[in-house]
């Protein structure tokens, strides 16, 4: 008798993706983040669903409804903090996942990589709109500042901003539509994640060496299912430590003040995972230039495959490129720190230098280092 797992139309898809999938025998823990992102997404959709049952997307009651969730709803506080801190875990996993792709040359799977970049943009859009929903001071002013950036687009800018706002300022219409988009986008992300996986399974996984692993494959289950479970346990441990011991560690105290259009907070800043991009935006004195730099800071990932000049795929055996990669990581941490600081000396100049370094490292130094390493191979 044939196994139902291998014959049933639905089970067959699951089997070929998660059970009998041939996987390289040497993929390290850096390959865990894909499954962790899946877990984060499921967690966010579930906690978000329960929050949406009690939330009201009206400017007069939004802030109160979030307070009501935390005070009166059974376990509402834990659902709310799991959702807020779950977003942080999501972005930690995202950054690790992208970093892994950059380090080991996974970007040579073009379709998988490009769908991944779209996923990153979609997740960032979702997180931004979610941050607006509690309707605190930072929610309101964050929404005002970031949507206002679109007014820098020549000719259509102002009309575009007012169209997004649904009026002449961030108000009821804006909050309602942001809630609608925040609800639908995670499902679009889930669909895109399936496309991401579909493209990945056309080629099979990369591995730390960057060398084809067709001669040495092992089944995904039980080897990598158990490895993913360990990763998931560590993820949940980290999340629950954050939720139960320091739920407001990564949040902004200003968001515990209801939104007030007449009172601007002294330092408007986004959640920590957007600070690097915010620092790049602020480091350019021109509005349109800043917006372009902001978009390019993420869109630059699309160019990475075309900038790959090395004869080797992975950075495992490329010490110069490794060095540049870790300088890039340090640069991004510097930008994250600067994004959270006020616009004054010496932060402005540090931010400008770090922004220049960011683009320089990716566009110039990495391809140059690869070419040098190619020449060193001849020695």
From Swiss-Prot:
The keyword Nucleotide-binding does not apply. It comes from the Eukaryota. It is a multi-pass membrane protein. Heme b b566 binds at residues 97, 196. Coiled coil: none annotated. Heme b b562 binds at residues 83, 182. Keywords: Electron transport, Heme, Iron, Membrane, Metal-binding, Mitochondrion, Mitochondrion inner membrane, Respiratory chain, Transmembrane, Transmembrane helix, Transport, Ubiquinone. InterPro entries: Cyt_b/b6_C, Cyt_b/b6_C_sf, Cyt_b/b6_N, Cytb/b6-like_sf, Cytochrome_b, Cytochrome_b_C_euk/bac, Cytochrome_b_N_euk/bac, Di-haem_cyt_TM. It is found in: Mitochondrion inner membrane. Its cofactor is heme b. A ubiquinone binds at residue 201. It holds the Pfam family Cytochrome_B. GO terms for molecular function: metal ion binding; ubiquinol-cytochrome-c reductase activity. GO terms for biological process: mitochondrial electron transport, ubiquinol to cytochrome c. The chain crosses the membrane at residues 33-53, 77-98, 113-133, 178-198, 226-246, 288-308, 320-340, 347-367. One of its GO terms (cellular component) is respiratory chain complex III. SUPFAM superfamilies: a domain/subunit of cytochrome bc1 complex (Ubiquinol-cytochrome c reductase), Transmembrane di-heme cytochromes. Binds 2 heme b groups non-covalently. The cytochrome bc1 complex contains 11 subunits: 3 respiratory subunits (MT-CYB, CYC1 and UQCRFS1), 2 core proteins (UQCRC1 and UQCRC2) and 6 low-molecular weight proteins (UQCRH/QCR6, UQCRB/QCR7, UQCRQ/QCR8, UQCR10/QCR9, UQCR11/QCR10 and a cleavage product of UQCRFS1). This cytochrome bc1 complex then forms a dimer. PANTHER family: CYTOCHROME B (PTHR19271:SF16). Heme 1 (or BL or b562) is low-potential and absorbs at about 562 nm, and heme 2 (or BH or b566) is high-potential and absorbs at about 566 nm. Belongs to the cytochrome b family. Component of the ubiquinol-cytochrome c reductase complex (complex III or cytochrome b-c1 complex) that is part of the mitochondrial respiratory chain. The b-c1 complex mediates electron transfer from ubiquinol to cytochrome c. Contributes to the generation of a proton gradient across the mitochondrial membrane that is then used for ATP synthesis. This is Cytochrome b. It comes from Oryx dammah.
